[in-house]
Amino acid sequence: MNFIDEVKIYIKGGNGGNGCVSFHREKFIDRGGPDGGDGGRGGSIIFRSNHHLNTLVNYRYKQHFIADSGENGKGSNKSGKSGKSLTLDVPIGTQIFAEDSDILLHDFTEDDQTFEIIKGGNGGLGNSHFKTSVNQAPRRRTEGEIAEEMWVQLSLKLLSDVGLVGLPNAGKSTFLSVVSAAKPKIADYPFTTLVPNLGVVYIDDEEFVIADIPGLIEGASQGHGLGDKFLKHIERCNVLIHLIDGSSEDVVADYNIVRTELESYSDYLKDKTQIICLNKIDVLTDEEIAEKTTQLQKITGKEIFPISTYTNTGITKIIKLALQTIKD
């Protein structure tokens, strides 16, 4: 399935039905009173979050959504039927913005939330409402209300507890496959991961969701590579696991590239707690591990965790630390 996280769609509520002009007709009664019924109310447009969805692909090709209009009123004081409301399902984490603006209309953070964005138009009044002492046979009625219409932008920000960040080939996809049941595409070339992947980690009778986004490169926050398109998906995370390729010739430069891109993208990411891991230590000597760990400690001022997704060295410790950070 295609991963689509940005769409623009047109939505319109159903118009109200028109009121009816009608007069009572019965045998032996020549001039019955007005009995025109009211028009039915138009249907509303409602968004609903659905945990079974993880992409906005349903709105990629169909982009116009209109609720049913109410039926016109009828004689014998019969009101028209109300139009059926239209419910549009979206993934949890979807945000709705007014067209071409930063005005947030709604943010879905839980399953089965609903948001009525457009109400259907009110039905018009039948002529029975306009009978007076001086006008016993009114031919007046009102038309149904025209419902609101608008274009909206849907933006999906995946909900996860932990975000994986690092340069391409830092080992993020392998890490995700080791700690969860997720099956991301894994290969030894940059940008194997082209879309975000989610995995659920189970440990000590608890669980949390971890997100792997495409690798960052220098200039990602300005649109280079793939990373800037998907950085928003880790803005909601509690903690970031920053993987650094231990086989790199300059681990400090690699760390600084990712740190700079996170800081440039948003304050949300800049202030996230990070667990910094020196990955792929299975290809390093003990001396190289010690040297690169020390280099990173000096530049970050934080503890560095040597790990290997190939031998599973240090993985459990990282997962437990991530869980504890989430709970704190």
Curated annotation (Swiss-Prot):
Organism superkingdom: Bacteria
Gene Ontology CC terms, in alphabetical order: cytoplasm
PROSITE patterns: G_OBG, GTP1_OBG, OBG
Obg domain segment(s): 1-159
Keyword Magnesium: yes
Residues annotated as binding Mg(2+): S173, T193
Keyword Lipid metabolism among UniProt keywords: no
UniProt function note: An essential GTPase which binds GTP, GDP and possibly (p)ppGpp with moderate affinity, with high nucleotide exchange rates and a fairly low GTP hydrolysis rate. Plays a role in control of the cell cycle, stress response, ribosome biogenesis and in those bacteria that undergo differentiation, in morphogenesis control.
HAMAP family reported in the protein's UniProt record: GTPase_Obg
Name listed for the protein in its UniProt record: GTPase Obg
Native source species: Rickettsia bellii (strain OSU 85-389)
Lineage: Bacteria, Pseudomonadati, Pseudomonadota, Alphaproteobacteria, Rickettsiales
